[in-house]
């Protein structure tokens, strides 16, 4: 018999690749009647929140890496302050379980949970484990993963789970516009890695439009993207487009796209699989190159698209890859490969996995 869970605290912060899965998990747990508290840093203004009303407490954090001594001292002090505040919030909320979603922002909360002997679970979104998740797996009850290759990298039981998806609209005027064009291309660079795609992709798509004059581009430029400049490139090239900083209804856009040009962060990877969207992946080169490993899995194991390393990016390389990706037979084969993989993915929820492990 599975144990009933009444309260869960989620330790989260950092990029959208950590925050979006945590918010989707929160929604899934709330549907199970669980009270959920988010503990972390930088969530209050994150665009993924939309109009959601969440129970959230800001927790200071710091990454004690090899930097200048004064910076290291400040970070350690911030980490300790976060640890103390996390202990206080956990004492007040009294959760049955704490779940860490990776990034150093989860560190003080996981430390506090360990000190208070609250069961810890982790969620790993990538093909390669993050440092905090790998460290705390030796203390955790279990790890829910998005991709099977990472299971063997942890010191506790790990299992593939079905990552909850962002809510999406069954009717969206954006989708109506997308489906009236052919082909439709979505460009999305993520919350932190969009600049390179914003600089390189629009000129290549202007070139591609010479072969596809009815092409439509939906470009998500990210919170720091220069929307006006990108619009100018498409407009000057005669390309039909929509450019925006953030797309609240990303799944609807992916479902309606013939090709997605994207980074290879964990959240977009999982959503590309769900939407069965053939893709060109341009992995962000930082953060121990985990996006490159994500992209390799998507391209070589699943067969869902192609990969271009950032150091290989040029207008000519992008144009060639986009034209190849828009070939109808290529789209058909890649979509079938994605469908075959997704049909065999685990359907077990994180909630079920946690209840079974307790």
Swiss-Prot record:
It is found in: Cell inner membrane. It is a peripheral membrane protein. It comes from the Bacteria. GO terms for biological process: carbohydrate metabolic process; cell division; cell wall organization; lipid glycosylation; peptidoglycan biosynthetic process; regulation of cell shape. One of its GO terms (cellular component) is plasma membrane. The keyword DNA-binding does not apply. Pathway: Cell wall biogenesis; peptidoglycan biosynthesis. It is an enzyme of class 2 (transferase). InterPro entries: GlcNAc_MurG, Glyco_trans_28_C, GlycoTrans_28_N. Its main location: membrane. Its EC number is 2.4.1.227. Keywords: Cell cycle, Cell division, Cell inner membrane, Cell membrane, Cell shape, Cell wall biogenesis/degradation, Glycosyltransferase, Membrane, Peptidoglycan synthesis, Transferase. The keyword Lipid metabolism does not apply. It catalyses: di-trans,octa-cis-undecaprenyl diphospho-N-acetyl-alpha-D-muramoyl-L-alanyl-D-glutamyl-meso-2,6-diaminopimeloyl-D-alanyl-D-alanine + UDP-N-acetyl-alpha-D-glucosamine = di-trans,octa-cis-undecaprenyl diphospho-[N-acetyl-alpha-D-glucosaminyl-(1->4)]-N-acetyl-alpha-D-muramoyl-L-alanyl-D-glutamyl-meso-2,6-diaminopimeloyl-D-alanyl-D-alanine + UDP + H(+). Cell wall formation. Catalyzes the transfer of a GlcNAc subunit on undecaprenyl-pyrophosphoryl-MurNAc-pentapeptide (lipid intermediate I) to form undecaprenyl-pyrophosphoryl-MurNAc-(pentapeptide)GlcNAc (lipid intermediate II). This is UDP-N-acetylglucosamine--N-acetylmuramyl-(pentapeptide) pyrophosphoryl-undecaprenol N-acetylglucosamine transferase. It comes from Chlamydia abortus (strain DSM 27085 / S26/3) (Chlamydophila abortus).
